[in-house]
Amino acid sequence: MRFNELNENKMWYKTIPQILEWLESKSKMPWIWLDTETTGLGGPKQQQLTQVSAIATQYDFKNNNFSEIGTFDEKIKLTDETKSKFDEPENKTKWVLGFNHYGSGDYKYKNESDIVDDFFKWIDNYSPNILVAQNAGFDMAMLSGRYGHKITNEVFDTKMLIQLYLLPLLQALAETDTKYKEMIDFIGTSGRDNGLISSSMAKIGPVLGINMTGYHDAITDCRITIQMYQKIVELLRNNQEVDIMKYQAERIKVIRESK
């Protein structure tokens, strides 16, 4: 996959003030928050997109506020290949569609290739920009891999902010404050995080006090991701003196070993 992903190495081994400075340096251009829904997690050769959504924003870093300057939200017709899977024993496509609210809302369902083309034309309206997503690699693989579009934009994965900054901060604070220990216990661990504290938005959102109603609808998830990011930045700003290096290094070691 070819896109200029903001590789996690660029976010490794920074202090809290350094990561805040890095985020501020990116705040002059539009931030486009995006999410996709698909028929499964098998990737662009096995699954199709069912929803592509994004919110273009201007970032007021000083006040940690985002102003919406545009939205993209489209649902996609099921391909014949997808429909043919419905009758396969053990196939979970129908369950996934229900999980992702497919069929709900006042949408005109359109062809997948047209929507992907339209999406890339739409983001060009805000160039240069930075694309922001939770677990960005998956969405970028689907958007670029289905019809061969190249993603040249900078990409920022909020999952990296969680893994390398939020969670290490909570761990450091938990050493002396039971409130943060309770937050960590609520989040729990995850196999997807190689047994470390989960970086899933489904766990991080609620512990930060975010209303998750409508979660797994792409446009809703964009808004939840914005709120989650704002809460994380607020926590980081309020704890800039905390040394997170021990816990960050532990996470980086596991990320390296899992590659």
Language-model regions, residue ranges each:
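Acidic two-metal-ion nuclease catalytic site recognized across multiple nuclease folds
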Residues: R2-W22, Y180-R192, V207, I219, ...
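Conserved non-catalytic scaffold segment of RNase H-like nuclease domains
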Residues: L6, K10-S144, T152, G195-S198, ...
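Short acidic, glycine/serine/threonine-rich helix-capping segments at coil-helix boundaries
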Residues: N211-A218
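Short alpha-helix plus adjacent loop in nuclease-associated cores
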Residues: T158-D193
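Catalytic phosphate/metal-binding cores of nucleic-acid and nucleotide-processing enzymes, i.e., regions
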Residues: T38-L49, Y59, N64, G145, ...
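Active-site catalytic pocket residues across diverse enzymes, especially alpha/beta-hydrolases
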Residues: Q58, Y147, I232-L236
